[in-house]
Amino acid sequence: DFDYKVEAHYEGCNNGLLQIDITRNELDVQRLETDYKALFDMPEMQSFPYTLDVFQKKTFHLEKHLSDLKLPNKQKLEFLQKDFGKFTFTFYFAKNSISDTKGEGDVERFPYKPISADRKKWLKQNVGVKIFRDNFRVRPYGEYGNDWLRLGDRYTTNPSGAGQRLGGYYIRRNQIVGAVEISRLDSKKLEDKSSREGLQENDVFDLFKEVLIGIIELFEKDRNHVMYYLSQLYDKNNPKGKTRREAENATRTGFSQENYQKIVAGYNTIKQQLDEKEDELSLLRNL
């Protein structure tokens, strides 16, 4: 029971390619084929991997050079990528609840699949990204409270939902279950600390973490793209819902003249809808 699964394999600098399989499992494909079919008429949803046939297959494949990833310092990659050797990184993205935001109309905006009642318990027991070297667990990575990839810090810089805007969407630290597999033979510069508790904090390990974040960002980009254009489709079909959502966002981002106008528009929309509901109730009372 998961929303996304990402499997990344790197065979070392001789090959130089990341082989990545991304499986989408968050949205109801049957509803995409019917109720949300207009999504695939959008120009932004007419190229790989966003076409309907790719959603129907669920899993798609990417090949990327490490240099294709979004890395803070690509010059460092040229000198150090050979030092961390082969690795495999597999992770699952899973929300705690059917929707990961509390905005009005969120469930109508996105055709979510139902989730298992046991998911929250499973997440609590397994959350985090663990490291295994030659099939043995390397602690403390992935233990409760050990956010060694600093996913929580990334999220706090921009805690917006995946459908709110393009770019800047980040996974939450409590939404990922993953494992990194390395070997002592291929990853000689990823060395144990003298205490045997963790790996030495050196340039190679820093780069390795940046590469893992770069792989996570491939998932984030995909989910952000899909959810953003689903949100655009909903706003096109529900302009009052868009006005309310803009007002909600404006209340969180501080005062400006533009935000003031959005809040006023949102207030007027809500008042109009309440008046319409009151008229409906009056008619029912008079029946």
Predicted regions: what they are:
Residues 40, 149-162, 246, 250, ...:
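Charged, glycine/proline-rich intrinsically disordered loops and linkers
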Residues 116, 124-228:
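GHKL/Bergerat-fold ATPase module
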Residues 14-15, 25, 73, 96, ...:
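Detector for Asparagine
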Residues 13, 17, 86, 104-106, ...:
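Intrinsically disordered, low-complexity regions
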Residues 1-128, 132-144, 191:
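Interdomain "switch/hinge" adjacent to the Bergerat
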